[in-house]
Swiss-Prot record:
Belongs to the dGTPase family. Type 2 subfamily. This is Deoxyguanosinetriphosphate triphosphohydrolase-like protein. It comes from the Bacteria. Keywords: Hydrolase. Residues 1-36 are annotated as: Disordered. Pfam families: HD, HD_assoc. Residues 25-36 have a biased composition (Basic and acidic residues). GO terms for molecular function: dGTPase activity. GO terms for biological process: dGTP catabolic process. It comes from Caulobacter vibrioides (strain NA1000 / CB15N) (Caulobacter crescentus). Residues 70-210 form the HD domain. The keyword Cytoplasm does not apply. The keyword Nucleotide-binding does not apply.
Length: 394
């Protein structure tokens, strides 16, 4: 007998697309898609989303084709978010949409790129990839004749900027000025938690990057399976895989361990979230926002294990000499280009040069920052070569 289709009833605190707070600019509704599904499709069709395929997480593209890029990471986050939202009875389209958007504002070369742009923009308003993501979807993407940005629903925008929790403590930072300005016109409730769907997207990001960094670290030879045996969470899982499947080679052993670790983290989030929902008595999406704590979360034991896993990854991967060397090269590339473009804006491409005109120095710096932040790793390397290596003239 065939199994019945998997079905979880809609949770009372799930977002209801038919009750969306709408879009900043009024549009006719789609006859074939919910508002949240429409947001998802708009994000997928952006140039910023396409460029994620050549923006890297830790390893620069020329180091190999087997490592994650921002695009593959984003797709993994979206898959986990959609599955987790479905299992919790939440709106899967909204969770997936926020997951797909969450990294759109990342510059080339991962966190090294963000660190360098923050330094270069320190006197001009700063740089924050979350704010840049918000600006991408509300300002920098211009694909429609009647408005700038993507005109996403209120719920998606709220999730983009608040998926990690309330942000009022950040509003004093110069880099968050754009958020404060937008909030004055289109209130996003920056002092409250976001929807359960947005919180799912945030946890899906944690699940995806912790697991794929273990995977990429082993693949790159930065650490071995034996090194992982004493690390919380992954160590016991590896031991179980080796005991149960001694026939597996090292590659399949570590892949099976990563698969089980994803499952363990998903199960933990589900159990903790359902416990918190029952304990708090939430009955609506607004009840979720009114809580003084996250609804979607890891258990305290899992959170502790993940903190120790991240500590291991920080020491053995993120600060490995090979990664440090790449970070140094990446920061030099972006820093030198930023200084040149700010000093000589006439060498910017025509469209960007036009944007830089009739602005003060801070305004020109923001245009330069936007141009660089939108680059892929490969394009940044090539642009730097053209600008600074005279051998290209030969």
């Amino acid at each position: 007998m065939s199994q019945a289709p998997y079905f979880v009833p809609r949770a009372p605190y799930a977002e209801d697309p038919s009750k969306s707070k709408g879009r900043r600019f009024k549009e006719d509704e789609s006859r074939t898609r919910t508002p949240f599904a429409r947001d998802r499709d708009r994000i997928i069709h952006t140039s910023a989303f396409r460029r994620l395929k050549e923006k890297t997480q830790v390893f620069v593209a020329h180091e190999g084709d087997n490592f994650r890029t921002r695009l593959t990471h984003t797709l993994e986050v979206a898959q986990v978010a959609r599955s987790l939202a479905t299992a919790l009875g939440l709106d899967a389209d909204l969770a997936e949409t926020i997951a797909l958007a969450h990294d759109l504002g990342h510059p080339p070369f991962g966190h090294a790129g963000e660190d360098e742009l923050e330094i270069q923009m320190r006197e001009y308003g700063g740089f924050d990839h979350n704010v840049q993501t918000f600006r991408v979807v509300t300002e920098l993407e211009h694909r429609y004749p009647d408005f700038i940005g993507l005109n996403l629903t209120w719920e998606t925008l709220e999730g983009v900027i608040k998926h990690n929790g309330p942000v009022t403590n950040k509003l004093g930072k110069p880099s968050w000025k754009a958020i404060s300005k937008y909030d004055n016109e289109y209130e996003l409730g920056l002092g409250t938690w976001a929807s359960a769907e947005a919180q799912v997207a945030a946890l899906a990001d944690d699940i995806a990057y912790n697991n794929h960094d273990v995977d990429d670290g082993v693949t790159a030879g930065l650490f071995t399976l034996d090194d992982l045996m004493d690390v919380p969470l992954i160590g016991p899982i590896l031991a179980a895989v080796k005991s149960e499947r001694p026939d597996l080679d090292a590659r399949l052993t570590h892949l099976e361990a990563v698969r089980r670790m994803i499952g363990a983290m998903v199960d933990d989030v589900m159990g903790e979230t359902l416990h918190r929902a029952a304990a708090s008595g939430v009955q609506s999406a607004d009840d979720v926002r009114a809580l003084d704590h996250a609804l979607v979360a890891f258990s305290s034991d899992m959170a502790e294990d993940l903190a120790r896993l991240r500590g291991f990854l920080y020491e053995r991967m993120y600060r490995h000499w090979r990664v440090n060397r790449t970070r140094s090269q990446a920061r030099r590339i972006l820093g030198e280009m930023f200084a040149l473009f700010l000093r000589e804006p006439e060498v910017l491409p025509t469209v960007w040069f036009a944007k830089s005109q009739n602005r003060d120095e801070a305004g020109r710096a923001r245009v330069v920052c936007d141009y660089i932040a939108g680059m892929t790793d490969r394009f940044a390397i090539e642009e730097h070569r053209k600008l600074f290596h005279l051998d290209v003239w030969n």
